[in-house]
Amino acid sequence: TSGKYTAKRTVAATGSEHPAPRYYQTHIGCELASLTNGLQGDSVRVISGNPLTGTHAASDGYLGGLDHQITLLPEGSEPKFLLTAGWLSPGLDKFSLSKSYPTWLLPKSKEFVMVTNTGGEERAFVVTGQYEPVFPFDIYPVQLIKSIMANDIDAMEKLGIYEVAPEDFALCEYPCTSKIDVQDIVRDGLDNLKKELG
């Protein structure tokens, strides 16, 4: 075998906070500062990868070894007044999958700025029907997650644990009213299954 190793990589610099979103020709493990145009500050979250499965990186950190994208999003940590920007506000600038805000009546061409704020803390995990519209497979994601949390191997197998990977549940974390880390739960379930069936 012969060949030439190249460490070159094309990286997409994305996100609403990036001053010049575009593709960069760079190399594996490059400094993120070279891709963020030196953007600094606590108000921006730098993600090595995409917003759903990427990892939080320092602005002076490095590109992940398997990543082909960096994302810059507003941190969303500033306090909001209850009536003007909090949960009692009319929410005319907020995106909602559950039609909690009247923005679902607006034209589909409206663009929203997504922030990293979860909008609350972890809550009880209940069946709400929010996962199914965004889940890419024809299985019952909520029941599968509940069986993983209960460590019920028979139920996990019947519900299709062997067909999924943690990344498949990434989009489920966005509309989740329970604010739980679904990908971590699925990863733990797969690890427990491997250990049990070893």
Predicted regions and their residues:
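Hydrophobic alpha-helical positions that pack around
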Residues: 1-52, 56-99
